[in-house]
């Protein structure tokens, strides 16, 4: 349960989260200190992962573990997207549990070298920012213009049993993207999407969160650009992957096996 929700950008927000005990009919605060973001239960419902001050934390309702410690505003972000990713790929959570809740993988954004852009803030009316009644304020954030450097991205995972953090080896261009990391039905796999900066070449990888090794499953190359809904609406099952694609000029569904072999186009039309 969350309260005191405050918007950050278009899709992101911070809030205070509480765990509700149905039997005891009581609330317990998820975490003290700064507000939290994207609190998400593990698939086995034993833990909650969330982001606070650009770092990932995991709680079992009683004990809290800080998974990352290098998060810093306008420098390093763990588990939530930077401004570019949130706008370009329409999501606000950049971590995923594995299928049985024993591991969590995330995208790390190093935006320390990205140039800063500043905006003036005024009092306004919805909501009213009274602190800017007499003089405007200023908000500065990392905003790469076209052709400028984006955040440097990397993939990591945390083993809840051992407490070990490892790097996940999923190839991507130096200026490319990881537009999504998703849960897979297989506990030894997370699904990672990569895309080049032109956004006309997308690839799906299965990566083992315990070893860091990855395998390419699907490559989707199109003349113009891969639409965001292709990333958002693809489904990874136990035996098949269902991928939307407009490769023939119209959006259709394509069925693949888990080795990335195309089985068939599911439906047709225009």
Annotate each language-model stretch with its function.
Residues 1-11, 47-55, 60, 93-96, ...:
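Beta-strand C-termini and the immediately following turn/loop, strongest in propeller blades
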Residues 16-18, 55-57, 154-156, 203-205, ...:
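A short loop-to-beta-strand structural motif that recurs across blades of beta-propeller domains
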Residues 28-31, 64-77, 166-169, 214-219, ...:
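Beta-propeller fold detector
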Residues 3-16, 67-95, 103-167:
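Predominantly five- to eight-bladed beta-propeller fold
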Residues 21-25, 60-63, 159-163, 208-212, ...:
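Short loop/turn segments that connect beta-strands within beta-propeller blades
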Residues 9, 144-148, 174, 219-233, ...:
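Beta-propeller and related beta-repeat scaffolds in trafficking/envelope systems
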Residues 10-59, 63-94:
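Asp-box/WD-like beta-propeller blade repeats and closely related beta-sheet repeat scaffolds
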Residues 74-90, 173-178, 223-230, 270:
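Short glycine-/Asp-/Thr-/Trp-enriched loop segments that recur within the blades
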